[in-house]
């Protein structure tokens, strides 16, 4: 879940972190993740409005309750991922400063709110929903990993030395 609240920075949103955010937003990894995320959102919407709706009508009451619960988790999980990806795209397109994207309100929730809850073993979910659940969980885990690496889980020892960082910039600007 994208956490809302008072604007606070996750960690130091200085030039180094902003550079990491901008580099990711411009990367092929972002392109692939964004494409996969948006395609999964569209596929899920089509499934839930079409075949999923029909399949849910064939379920017994207990299974239908499990279906409703898991489909809500699925849509919540995907909306969280889509929101995160849209923030990264806004950085890429210049609509948001990389430092602003470091704000804690744009992070994925640390709680397992979007995590799948085990359903009673008697509940058999339709294959289409089960497939979407597995794929959305994998995507969420990957985006959570990216979020933590880019914004939260950075040890001070991992940050580049300020002098070395400046030397690298000078070398890049003026060549070796």
What is each stretch, according to the model?
Residues 2-176:
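Surface-exposed peri-terminal alpha-helical interaction modules
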